[in-house]
UniProtKB/Swiss-Prot annotation:
<feature type="disulfide bond">
    <location>
        <begin position="6"/>
        <end position="36"/>
    </location>
</feature>
<feature type="disulfide bond">
    <location>
        <begin position="14"/>
        <end position="33"/>
    </location>
</feature>
<dbReference type="Pfam" id="PF00050">
    <property type="entry name" value="Kazal_1"/>
</dbReference>
<dbReference type="GO" id="GO:0004867">
    <property type="term" value="F:serine-type endopeptidase inhibitor activity"/>
</dbReference>
<feature type="site" description="Reactive bond 3">
    <location>
        <begin position="16"/>
        <end position="17"/>
    </location>
</feature>
<keyword id="KW-1015">Disulfide bond</keyword>
<protein>
    <recommendedName>
        <fullName>Ovomucoid</fullName>
    </recommendedName>
</protein>
<keyword id="KW-0325">Glycoprotein</keyword>
<dbReference type="InterPro" id="IPR002350">
    <property type="entry name" value="Kazal_dom"/>
</dbReference>
<keyword id="KW-0677">Repeat</keyword>
<keyword id="KW-0646">Protease inhibitor</keyword>
<feature type="disulfide bond">
    <location>
        <begin position="22"/>
        <end position="54"/>
    </location>
</feature>
<dbReference type="GO" id="GO:0005576">
    <property type="term" value="C:extracellular region"/>
</dbReference>
<dbReference type="InterPro" id="IPR051597">
    <property type="entry name" value="Bifunctional_prot_inhibitor"/>
</dbReference>
<dbReference type="InterPro" id="IPR036058">
    <property type="entry name" value="Kazal_dom_sf"/>
</dbReference>
<feature type="domain" description="Kazal-like">
    <location>
        <begin position="4"/>
        <end position="54"/>
    </location>
</feature>
<keyword id="KW-0722">Serine protease inhibitor</keyword>
Length: 54
């Protein structure tokens, strides 16, 4: 299981950096910050599927 540490990311104001992450919801997030915001909104139910586009 791969885990992303979301403690370094704000709940808003992500950069436009493109480093895609595929979530367990089969949605591609543009970077760790965007993914971490989605994790927070899902109350922790969203997990990392893999790095890169889904």
């Amino acid at each position: 299981v791969v885990i992303v540490d979301c403690s370094d990311y704000p709940t808003h104001g992500c950069t436009l950096e493109l480093k895609p992450i595929c979530g367990s919801d089969n949605q591609t997030y543009s970077n760790k910050c965007g993914f971490c915001n989605a994790v927070a909104q899902s109350n922790g139910t969203l997990t990392l599927s893999h790095f890169g586009k889904c």
